[in-house]
A protein has these predicted regions:
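Alpha-helical transmembrane segments and their membrane-interface junctions
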Residues: 93-113
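Alpha-helical transmembrane segments and their immediate juxtamembrane interface regions
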Residues: 108-151
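Alpha-helical transmembrane segments
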Residues: 31-53, 127-133
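Loop-to-transmembrane boundary segments
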Residues: 78-98
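Transmembrane helix-loop junctions in multipass membrane proteins, especially transporters and channels
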Residues: 8-13, 55-66, 110-117, 147-151
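Active-site and channel-lining beta-strand-loop segments
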Residues: 5-37
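Juxtamembrane inter-helical linkers in multi-pass membrane proteins
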Residues: 60-81
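Hydrophobic alpha-helical membrane-insertion segments
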Residues: 1-4, 44-48, 91-99
Length: 151
């Protein structure tokens, strides 16, 4: 949070808040606490949601969305345990990657606000697309491992 406060103080009175695919600003906002801290607030809310929902997997396994759920629900508690651990690890990995994405988006907005031409850093689009591919890879990796444990 200290970094967000420090960055907020250095923002101009109006800064870019939305960018097109090429990193050119196409939306602007006035400097205010809400507009700057909404992204960290959403990030924290998402992290909190994932933190609190993950333990519910064990209490309400019928709500887990995994391949072979019917077979999973029929397993003994002992055989369900490795699946729960994998599902918890998956949620943890996604939470970490999403936090890093939100942090990067905030950094890119700050960087654009202070740069000539207000452009996002040139690698921003690649990072955001790469993030999506990486998350998809994580999900596939864990779902394959979960399927192996259920079979």
């Amino acid at each position: 949070m200290v970094g967000y406060v420090w960055a907020y103080q250095s923002l101009p009175l109006r800064y870019p808040s939305h960018f097109n695919f090429d990193g050119v600003p196409d939306g602007w906002t006035d400097k205010n606490l809400f507009s700057w801290f909404i992204i960290p607030a959403i990030s924290l809310a998402l992290l909190s949601f994932m933190y609190f929902i993950t333990p519910l997997f064990r209490k309400y396994p019928q709500f887990i969305n995994i391949p072979g759920k019917e077979k999973f629900l029929e397993l003994s508690d002992e055989r369900k345990e490795p699946v729960f651990k994998l599902a918890e690890n998956l949620m943890g990995m996604i939470a970490i990657v999403e936090q890093l994405l939100f942090l990067y988006i905030q950094y890119a907005m700050w960087s654009a606000a202070l740069s000539p031409g207000n452009m996002m850093p040139p690698h921003s689009t690649l990072i955001i697309i790469g993030h999506s591919v990486f998350v998809l890879g994580i999900v596939i990796f864990y779902l394959v491992k979960i399927s192996d444990k259920i079979d």
